[in-house]
Swiss-Prot record:
Gene name for this UniProt entry: murC
EC number: 6.3.2.8
Single GO molecular function: ATP binding
GO cellular component: cytoplasm
Pathway the protein contributes to: Cell wall biogenesis; peptidoglycan biosynthesis
Catalytic activity, as annotated: UDP-N-acetyl-alpha-D-muramate + L-alanine + ATP = UDP-N-acetyl-alpha-D-muramoyl-L-alanine + ADP + phosphate + H(+)
Keywords assigned: ATP-binding, Cell cycle, Cell division, Cell shape, Cell wall biogenesis/degradation, Cytoplasm, Ligase, Nucleotide-binding, Peptidoglycan synthesis
The organism of origin for this protein: Methylobacterium radiotolerans (strain ATCC 27329 / DSM 1819 / JCM 2831 / NBRC 15690 / NCIMB 10815 / 0-1)
UniProt cross-references to InterPro entries, sorted A to Z: Mur-like_cat_sf, Mur_ligase_C, Mur_ligase_C_dom_sf, Mur_ligase_cen, Mur_ligase_N, MurCDEF_pg_biosynth, UDP-N-AcMur_Ala_ligase_MurC
Pfam families, A to Z: Mur_ligase (PF01225), Mur_ligase_C (PF02875), Mur_ligase_M (PF08245)
UniProt keyword Transferase present: no
Gene Ontology BP annotations: cell division; cell wall organization; peptidoglycan biosynthetic process; regulation of cell shape
Residues annotated for ATP binding in this entry: G114, T115, H116, G117, K118, T119, T120
Protein name: UDP-N-acetylmuramate--L-alanine ligase
Amino acid sequence: MKLPDKLGPIHFIGIGGIGMSGIAEVMHNLGYTVQGSDASDNANVRRLAEKGMRTFVGHDAKNVEEAALVVVSTAIRRDNPELQAARERRLPVVRRAEMLAELMRFKSCVAIAGTHGKTTTTSLVATLLDAGNLDPTVINGGIINAYGTNARMGAGEWMVVEADESDGTFLKLPADVAIVTNIDPEHLDHFGSFDAIKDAFRRFIDNIPFYGFAVMCIDHPVVQDLVGHIEDRRIITYGENPQADVRLIDVDLRGGQSRFRVMIRDRRPGYRMEMEDLVLPMPGKHNALNATAALAVAHELGVKPDAIRQALAGFGGVKRRFTRTGEWNGATIFDDYGHHPVEIKAVLKAARASTEHGVIAVVQPHRYTRLQSLFDDFCTCFNDADTVIVAPVYAAGEQPIEGFDRDSLVAGLRSRGHRDARALERPEELAGIIADLAKPGDYVVCLGAGTITQWAYALPDELTARGR
């Protein structure tokens, strides 16, 4: 039995979330009656309302009076008044991943998983399949700049989705093709141990049907080890590793973009193809690797090399992934979602490779538990920044943990040899600090998953208002 064509109103609790909003938009485009609520009137809520969906700001039992079905994410607490009202009425309550899985049954699906790089890789796969006239449906964990949204309804056979591993629900997704970019210790609050995370990724690959395949980055030692434990499924490896089936070669990161070539060597004897003069208008070797994963999938699905080359060169990027927010006095300000030490290190390395001048990092640590569990890594991931400005921790609903806060991180950076780590008392002071520090040609990179994105977009105007 498939998802019925006709359902009563489908109510999304937390419809403004990046994952929920994408599913809601696709279901609306399929002709379902979609409504939803969110705690705040954010950009996603406004976008969905403009598309004709009924939205509520705030959670209230009255919001589900007309609903026939309720969709929730794991972020919604059991005492949410709308969830309680739905259960009192015995309405079906569906988890976000379960609803995404239902949508995926309509199509052949590419699912992108990994601790880092999922959103950019999902966007790149969608872009390359689009260039090959495959017209994919897309549900992403970030706003794709070319679409102006994180979701797109296509008429083709394929669907491209970001597979969120944070709560383990990615194991519900019926993927035909899977990408694994990397596997690092993250979301330990859910999994309990790194071994449990690695086991979840193994099961994710094992779930692929016999006619599908997995694309896996063997530059990452944990992923390479996982490849050795996968049996009876087709694996295509990628990376700079000389043993990769799809090998990234001659990466040049100068000028704020990535130039490279890729060699494809199938396990079939004698098959070899090279794609040269590839340009991605994003800096960073991590982004060149993401592009290589997308290229591997596109090539396997029949997209021509010239179409791949043109699509990569025209890639418009993803919101909050090394996004330029403006300039001041010759210095460029960027906004980036990076909030894990591996992500921060990769972004700052990309910044360092893209400018011959200084790099100033502004970081808002996200969650006390993450800072605690990865503290040593946080203290050593800022080496490519000349100056690190540390804001107070964005709690995301958590209680403070003694010894793991802004001042602890500043002290940890200094004790491990960083020459210029300093604390930010209040966001209002940031413009003054940057005005004193930044010189023409410098990059100012704002990092974090909290409210720092608002600071990054406000900073150019605030600096201009101060004069030069």
